[in-house]
Regions:
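Alpha-helical transmembrane segments in multipass membrane proteins, preferentially the mid-helix core
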Residues: 62-73, 140-148
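Loop-to-transmembrane helix junctions at the membrane interface
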Residues: 66-102
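Interfacial non-cytosolic loop connecting adjacent transmembrane helices
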Residues: 41-53, 97-131
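Membrane-interface helix-boundary motifs at transmembrane edges
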Residues: 9-17, 46, 72-82
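Membrane-water interface at the C-terminal end of transmembrane alpha helices
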Residues: 129-156
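Canonical alpha-helical transmembrane segments of integral membrane proteins
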Residues: 22-37, 59-61, 87-96
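Generic alpha-helical transmembrane segments
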Residues: 29, 50-68, 93-96, 133-134
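Cytosolic juxtamembrane helix and N-cap/initiation of the first transmembrane helix
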Residues: 1-35, 144-150, 162-164
C-alpha cells in the first residue's frame, strides 16, 4: 500500500468515525473551568465575592459548561461551526482572567480590624493556569475540529466527483 492509499483510507474512515480528539479537548476545557470556579468559590474572604460580579460569574460558568458541552458533541460530528464557537469561547476564557481573578488579587478586605488579601498569589496563579488551560483546550479543539471538518468535506467532494 502506498502513502497516498493510506491517506485515502484514513480520510474515508473519517466518514464513519467520530472526531474524538476535539470532543475530548472540549470536555477537558470544562474540567479546567470546574477547577477554576471551585477554587474561586471555596475561598471565603469576608463578603468580597458576594456581589453582582459573583452572580455574573456563576451564570458565565453555567453558560460556558453548557455551550462547550454542546460544541463537544458538534465537533465530534465534524461540524465546523461548533469549532468556530470553541475558538470564540477560548478567547472569552482569556478575557475572564482580567475580570474576577485580577480584581480579587489586588483587593483587600478588613476583617476583625485586619487587612486581608482577598486572593493570595498562589491561588491567583492557580486560577490563571486553570483559565489559560481551559482556553488552550478550546483553541486546540477548535483548530483540530476546523481542520478535520475541511479534510472530510474535501474528501466527500472528491467522492461525489468520482460518482458523477
Amino acid at each position: 500500500m502506498s502513502m497516498n492509499e493510506d491517506k485515502l483510507i484514513q480520510r474515508d474512515r473519517m466518514r464513519f468515525t467520530k472526531n474524538t480528539l476535539s470532543s475530548s479537548l472540549a470536555l477537558l476545557a470544562i474540567l479546567f473551568n470546574v477547577l477554576y470556579f471551585v477554587s474561586i468559590y471555596r475561598s471565603d474572604v469576608g463578603s468580597y465575592y458576594y456581589n453582582i460580579i459573583l452572580g455574573a460569574s456563576v451564570l458565565c460558568n453555567l453558560l460556558f459548561m453548557l455551550t462547550v458541552f454542546l460544541c463537544s458533541e458538534g465537533v465530534k460530528g465534524y461540524k465546523a461551526s461548533y469549532a468556530y464557537v470553541l475558538l470564540g469561547i477560548g478567547a472569552l476564557q482569556i478575557l475572564r482572567i482580567f475580570i474576577l481573578p485580577m480584581r480579587a488579587h489586588g483587593a483587600t478586605v478588613t476583617l476583625n480590624q485586619q487587612e486581608i488579601v482577598v486572593m493570595q498569589t498562589a491561588q491567583f496563579v492557580r486560577v490563571i493556569v486553570y483559565l489559560a488551560a481551559s482556553a488552550v483546550c478550546c483553541f486546540v479543539a477548535g483548530i483540530v475540529g476546523i481542520h478535520k471538518s475541511r479534510v472530510l468535506a474535501a474528501h466527500m467532494a472528491t467522492l461525489e466527483q468520482k460518482v458523477a
